[in-house]
Regions:
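Short basic helix-loop element that most often maps to the first helix and adjoining turn
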Residues: 3-22
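Short amphipathic recognition helices of helix-turn-helix/homeodomain-type DNA-binding modules
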Residues: 58-65
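Residues in the recognition helix of alpha-helical DNA-binding motifs
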Residues: 22, 33, 62
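DNA major-groove recognition helix of helix-turn-helix/homeodomain DNA-binding modules
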Residues: 43-58
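Residues in the helix-turn-helix
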Residues: 18, 29, 58
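Recognition helix of helix-turn-helix/homeodomain-like DNA-binding domains
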Residues: 25-38
């Protein structure tokens, strides 16, 4: 799953640890999601959407295939 977490985080000058704290997950989880190695749970995706005040589909996009 592609996502814009890294871009959104950088726009706010947040570290991965800052985002992890806001989402109540580990920094390693944020890193794995940003790299596309881990897909977030639906509750975590909603939490990120609320945090950035964006629709989920603007942050996360399914990759065809």
């Amino acid at each position: 799953m592609k996502n814009k977490l890294k871009v959104l985080r950088a726009e706010r000058d947040w570290t991965q640890a800052d985002l992890a704290n806001a989402l109540e997950v580990s920094r390693q989880t944020v890193n794995a999601i940003e790299k596309g190695k881990f897909d977030p749970s639906l509750p975590l995706a909603f939490k990120a959407a609320r945090l950035f005040n964006l629709p989920i589909e603007e942050i996360f996009q399914d990759e065809p295939g």
